[in-house]
Structures are given as structure tokens and as C-alpha cells.
Regions:
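A short SAM/SAH-binding and catalytic strip from SAM-dependent methyltransferases
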Residues: 101-116
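Conserved SAM-binding loop of SAM-dependent methyltransferases across substrates and taxa
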Residues: 39-51
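Conserved SAM/SAH-binding beta-strand->alpha-helix loop
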Residues: 61
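A short acidic, Gly/Pro-enriched loop at the edge of an enzyme's catalytic core
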Residues: 93-103
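Conserved SAM-binding strand-loop segment of SAM-dependent methyltransferases
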Residues: 77-89
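Conserved SAM-binding loop
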Residues: 68-69
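A short glycine-rich, Lys/Arg-flanked "PGG" loop and its adjoining helix->strand segment in the class I
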Residues: 119-132
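Conserved beta-strand signature within the Rossmann-like core of class I S-adenosyl-L-methionine
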Residues: 133-140
Length: 151
């Protein structure tokens, strides 16, 4: 799928992140939560692929969020991308906002087993923010896998 995007649209996306985004089920119009967005490159690419959908990208690092916001002015002003500085285990869906169809994370300690207690809390928070059919895809940068969520 990445071959269908002009070079100028994907220039800030590494091969690793391009492969991650290529592996995600991204029908047009969906709502996506990215956990651990870093400087926002994957979030911007997902926005490009989901038509009139929406991406809400979170990261615990204030510096990462500042970089993401600085590099995403057009996507933010379109209303299709938002960033929030919050840890996965502390995230809550803002009141009145529709739930997400998909959540994804790459190399996030709370979701890859490095921080089990934070992971339990994060999974509960993510499940609460997804539609009943919503999916969570987690990866290590080389492969993505779907995690079962507590419902």
C-alpha cells in the first residue's frame, strides 16, 4: 500500500513505521487511537490513509507531543488529528467523544510486557475507549499482532 503514496507525502516516515502502518486495518472514515506516538510520523500517515476519519495520538512525553504538534499543523487544523500528553495507563476517552475503532502501539512499555502493572491498567483504559468491535494492534517495530482486550 505504501507504493501508492507519493514520496513527498511519506518522506518523514521510516521504513519501519511505514511497515507498521501498512499492517494496520485502516478503512476510510475510522477513528484511530495511537499509543506512544513519539513525534507523530505514524499518526500523520494514518490520517492520510483514512479519508475523513480521525486520529487521536497520545504519548507520555511532553517533548514528543511538542514535536508532534509542531510537525502536524495541517492535519491538526483539518480537525482530523489531535495529540494529547498522557500515559496509556492514565488515558480516558474525553466525555462526549465517540469511541475508537482501532488502537495501535509500537514499542510501548505498558503494552509489551516491560511494565506489567501499567499494562493491566492501560489495557483496561484502552478497552473502555474502543467500540465493542474495536481492536488493539501492538508491535515491536518488526511485526504487529492483535491483543485481546478485557471486555
Amino acid at each position: 500500500m505504501s507504493g501508492s503514496y507519493p514520496e513527498e507525502m511519506t518522506r518523514d516516515l521510516s521504513d519501519r513505521l511505514r511497515a507498521v502502518v501498512d499492517a494496520l486495518p485502516l478503512p476510510e472514515g475510522m477513528r484511530v487511537l495511537e499509543i506512544g506516538c513519539g513525534p507523530g510520523a505514524a499518526a500523520r500517515e494514518v490520517v492520510r490513509r483514512i479519508g475523513d476519519g480521525h486520529v487521536h495520538a497520545i504519548d507520555r512525553s511532553p517533548r514528543a507531543i511538542a514535536q508532534a504538534v509542531a510537525g502536524s499543523a495541517a492535519e491538526i487544523s483539518s480537525g482530523r488529528l489531535a495529540f494529547e500528553q498522557v500515559a496509556a495507563e492514565d488515558f480516558t476517552l474525553p466525555a462526549g467523544r465517540p469511541p475508537f475503532d482501532l488502537a495501535f502501539a509500537v514499542r510501548v512499555g505498558a503494552l509489551d510486557g516491560r511494565h506489567p502493572e501499567a499494562g493491566r491498567q492501560a489495557l483496561s483504559r484502552i478497552a473502555a475507549a474502543l467500540t465493542p468491535a474495536g481492536r488493539l494492534m501492538v508491535g515491536d517495530g518488526a511485526a504487529m499482532a492483535e491483543l485481546r482486550l478485557p471486555r
